Amino acid sequence: SAASDVYKRQMLTDNFGNPSSLHNLGINAMKQIILARGAIADSLGVDKDEIIFTSGATEANNMALFGAAKAKKRLGNRIVTTAIEHESVLESAKELEKQGFEVVFLEPDIHGNISEEQLFEAVNKNTILVSMMYINNEVGTVMPVKSVAKAVKRAGAPALVHIDCVQAYGKVNINPKKLGADLVSITAHKIHGPKGVGALYV
């Protein structure tokens, strides 16, 4: 859009300084980061200190999966996801599988749906992470993300819940706390923002 193009040009020409620097360019850049972090936090209904900027959706998803698995590995070994996640999630899950984690890839039906029953059956007391996208980027299926936290609680699992909201952000209302999500991935380019900018709610 015209508005986003103007803002992007402004960031490239006026606010390109190192935000860690003490000179004016750096200070101005830091102000923009603080404003952006606050805007994203407000859109999700979370605290600004819970937002980490990344280089995009892939890094946000990688960080969520590897970070959660390593943080919880003493409490269990099972990771539950679906077979139709974004490649950044699937490849991370496969790498964790090579490292010795038990990864369950839930298979969708012919319409691309994953049922709540599949989720409840897959999540057990040994589950340390459940990762699922909110809306599938290929077929548009709305996944049962609201049931993920319910499945974790029902199983008495120590699992963290990661929801990939990249395709959903800006289209549906997302509140990580209401979803019971510990980690949420989003990215700018899906809402007409610049490429190479993403965020992870932690």
Residue ranges and their predicted role:
Residues 1-202:
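Pyridoxal 5′-phosphate
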